Every structure is written in C-alpha cells, then in structure tokens.
Amino acid sequence: LPVTIIDDQEVIIGFYPKKLIPALGLQVQVDLVGKTSWLAEKYVTMIGATIRAIAELSPEHLHKSLPWREHWSLRDLFMHVLSFPELAWWSHQCGSMSTEDMRATDRRLKDVQTAPAMIAYGEGVRQNILEFLQSNNVVAFDRVVPAHYGGEVTVLELLSLILSHSTHHLKQAYWFIDHELHVTLTNPATAEDLEGIVTPAALF
C-alpha cells in the first residue's frame, strides 16, 4: 500500500484523497458527478466485454487451467473479474472489502460454473453498480472503508481502483483466449473502449 508521511508526524496509509488533499494543502475539488458518470460508462463497457467473451467459449475452454496461476481456470479468472467489482460496490453496505470478504464471495460463487450462470451473475453485478453510480448517494460514495486494495479509501475510490484491477485481468483473459485457446473473439473490448482505465504495463 502507498504510505504518505507529512512533516515526519502524520502518516496516511493507502490512497485516501479525503485525508491527503487537506494534509498536503492541495487546492482541488473532487468532481463526483463527472467521476460517477465516467465510472458507470467504463464498468458497463468492461463487464459487458467480459460477458460477451464468456458467451463465446465452450465449457472446455472455460475450465482450461491458467499457466501463470496455479489451481485457477479461465472460469476462475472471469469470476474474479466480475466478483471484485461486486465486492467494491457492496462495501458501501458492509463497510469493508477485506480478504475475508473475498473468501466469503468465493465460497458463495463456487457453484457458478456454467457460461449461462456466469453471464447471469455478471449482468446482476453490472446492473447493481450502474444503479449505485446513478443514485447520487453522496453519503454512500464518500463512505470510508478499509480495503485489501488501497488501504482506507472511499467507496467511489475503491470502485475506481477495482475497475483498473478487473480490466487488467480481462486483458490477461484476452491473451489466454488468443494465445492458448486460439479462439478469435468476435467483439472484444477495444483500446478505445478501455481508454482512461489505468492498468499495469506488464500483462503478467
């Protein structure tokens, strides 16, 4: 996690603009309306691309093992792409996105194994996130939650971090489908579709 130390006295752990902006004396305003609109658009795009990819693959494809992640199949990677946004969204209710929250979600979703079930789950996640981001619920957006990714962050900041995280894993799935399964998807997300979503330069 990032750590900011101010005047050798104040320590701020995590990506926490609500504390960092006043502590550093920054004269900036956070545009929540613009932020939520952009996040909603990109989540609809990213989750939609994930759903389309799942729909084109056979059961054999979905259960192929990944060479870079022991004990994971392509199905597991796709469920990771979809479940982390759900966890980030749900943090506005449960108050965290912890490793235990992640393990509980894995247990809850362990029987979601077929493409239709995965697609139905993804569509539900997309709808919940879209409705939340369009709700103008500033109190929920600004709720500070402890998260495995980012430290102490607001729910809106967590959704932004997880958008990047899931998009990076979607790109890994695209690579696997192309290079290992030798399947050409008919309508993958383009670079333009994902423009503005920051992901690591290294794919793995």
What are these regions (language model features)?
Residues 3-30:
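Non-catalytic, surface beta->alpha helical segment in thiol-disulfide oxidoreductase systems
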Residues 36, 42-56, 107-146, 153-172:
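Acidic/histidine-rich alpha-helical segments that form the ligand environment
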Residues 61-107, 144-204:
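Short, contiguous alpha-helical
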Residues 27, 54, 61, 96, ...:
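A general structural signal marking secondary-structure boundaries and capping sites
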Residues 1-2, 58-59, 200:
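Short, proline-centered helix/strand-breaking motifs
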